């Protein structure tokens, strides 16, 4: 029975190792694709730019909506950041495990060198052996060849693990880059959210000031309205007072007119009396008395009753405004004076 060679064993083991390696690579690529699909940082995220603060309610409503939108985006970014950190931690754990396995396998002796030494020893024994002992030596040699094949498979598996480790390192680098981008975006959203909150606070304070000014203006308008009502009441009162004063003025003017008429009549009477005293009283007694009686028979003087009012004076007395007593007392004094002059 011919001896199996190491190269033939290696060729028989290689397809199985390649299939396992391809399966591992496909699993690794599927894991990367799943990671890429599950992580979509910042997709369709449009952060609004902040504008100037508006004191009108519509601007405040829009600003509040933008702040709530930013807060929701910030929460989504925090959740994605947490998932990225978990993926990075898992990748680090897998990397560490692969490094440990690779380190353990690197401490084992090199199976390729052992295979080469075994092949050289087998050829040497093949040349030196007797033909009758071929079957016996073949059975003895099959055990180390199978052992070498297992070690070669382990080596190939170690190489696959090393390739996986390299791919995992690339994945970790990519996750770190995405994590850095997410942290930057999270920081930017936080700053923008803080800026919008400050603008909202400024707008709220400005609206509060405007409302305070508005309340003050309303109170001023109310006070001015009350003052205007008071002024209207005062104006109406003054108008009534002015009307009453005008009525009193008209009454006084009428009284003054009557007094002027009476004064004119008194002046005429005084002139007549002076004329009588200066001219007609120079006659002797009886003639003078008779003439005096004749003179006063018209109603100016009555020796028994005193001085009489001239015609038309009684009506003026009746029309006077409360001055009848003063007029009568004045006429009595004038009559007494006239009587004394007559006795002389």
UniProtKB/Swiss-Prot annotation:
From the UniProt record, list the coiled-coil ranges: 60-108, 145-273
Q: Which UniProt keywords apply?
A: Cell membrane, Coiled coil, Membrane, Nucleus
Classify the source by domain of life: Eukaryota
The observed outcome of changing residue 270 to P is:
No visible phenotype
Q: Where in the cell is it found?
A: Cell membrane; Nucleus
Q: Which GO terms describe its cellular component?
A: nucleus; plasma membrane; pollen tube tip
Name the gene behind this protein.
ICR1
Explain what induces or represses this protein's expression: Up-regulated by auxin.
Q: Compositional bias (Polar residues) spans? A: 196-211
Expression sites (tissue/organ)? Expressed in mature and germinating pollen. Expressed throughout the embryo but not in the hypophysis and quiescent center (QC). In roots, absent from the QC and the stem cells.
Subunit: Homooligomer. Interacts with ARAC3, ARAC4, ARAC8, ARAC11 and SEC3A, but not with ICR2 or EXO70A1.
Q: How does it sit in the membrane?
A: Peripheral membrane protein
Q: Does the keyword Hydrolase apply?
A: no
Domain notes for this protein: Interactions with ROPs and SEC3A require an intact C-terminal coiled-coil domain.
Principal localization?
A: membrane
Q: Look up keyword Coiled coil and say if it applies.
A: yes
Biological process annotations from GO: regulation of auxin polar transport
Which species is the source of this protein? Answer: Arabidopsis thaliana (Mouse-ear cress)
Query: Where are the annotated segments for Disordered?
Result: 1-74, 92-139, 186-218, 307-344
The text of the family note is:
Belongs to the ICR family.
Biased composition (Basic and acidic residues) is annotated at 93-103, 114-139, 186-195
Q: Where is the composition biased (Low complexity)?
A: 19-29
Q: What's the protein here called?
A: Interactor of constitutive active ROPs 1
Null allele outcome, as annotated, is: Plants have cubical adaxial epidermal pavement cells and show a loss of root stem-cell population due to a colapse of the root meristem. Pollen development is also compromised.
Free-text function comment from the UniProt entry = Acts as a scaffold, mediating interaction of ROPs with different proteins. Required for primary and adventitious root maintenance, but not for their formation. Promotes the stabilization of ARAC11 on the plasma membrane of the pollen tube initiation site but not the activation of ARAC11. Regulates directionality of polar auxin transport, and is required for the formation of a stable auxin maximum and tip localized auxin gradient during embryogenesis, organogenesis, and meristem activity. Involved in exocytosis and in the recycling of PIN proteins back to the plasma membrane.
């Amino acid at each position: 029975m011919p001896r199996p060679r190491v190269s033939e064993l290696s060729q028989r083991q290689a397809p199985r190792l390649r299939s396992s390696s391809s399966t591992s690579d496909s699993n690794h690529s599927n894991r990367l694709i799943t990671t890429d699909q599950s992580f979509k940082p910042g997709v369709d995220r449009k952060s609004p730019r902040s504008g100037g603060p508006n004191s009108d309610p519509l601007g405040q409503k829009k600003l509040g909506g933008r702040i709530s939108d930013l807060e929701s985006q910030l929460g989504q970014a925090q959740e994605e950041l947490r998932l990225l950190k978990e993926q990075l931690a898992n990748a680090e754990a897998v990397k560490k495990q692969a490094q440990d396995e690779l380190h353990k396998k690197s401490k084992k002796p090199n199976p390729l060198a052992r295979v080469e030494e075994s092949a050289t020893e087998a050829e040497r024994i093949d040349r030196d052996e007797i033909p009758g002992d071929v079957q016996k030596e073949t059975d003895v040699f099959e055990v180390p060849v199978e052992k070498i094949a297992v070690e070669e498979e382990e080596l190939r598996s170690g190489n696959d693990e090393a390739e996986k480790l390299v791919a995992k390192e690339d994945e970790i680098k990519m996750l770190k880059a995405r994590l850095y981008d997410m942290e930057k975006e999270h920081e930017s959203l936080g700053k923008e959210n803080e800026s919008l909150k400050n603008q909202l606070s400024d707008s709220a304070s400005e609206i509060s000031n405007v409302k305070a000014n508005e309340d003050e203006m309303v109170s001023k308008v109310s006070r001015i309205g009350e003052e205007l009502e008071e002024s209207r009441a005062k104006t109406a009162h003054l108008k009534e007072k002015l009307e009453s004063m005008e009525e009193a003025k008209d009454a006084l003017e009428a009284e003054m007119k009557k007094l002027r008429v009476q004064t004119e009549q008194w002046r005429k009477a005084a002139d007549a009396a002076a004329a009588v005293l200066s001219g007609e009283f120079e006659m002797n007694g009886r003639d003078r008395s008779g003439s005096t009686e004749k003179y006063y028979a018209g109603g100016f003087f009555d020796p028994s009753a005193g001085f009489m009012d001239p015609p038309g004076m009684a009506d003026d007395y009746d029309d006077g405004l409360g001055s009848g007593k003063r007029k009568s007392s004045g006429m009595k004094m004038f009559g007494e004076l006239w009587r004394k002059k007559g006795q002389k």
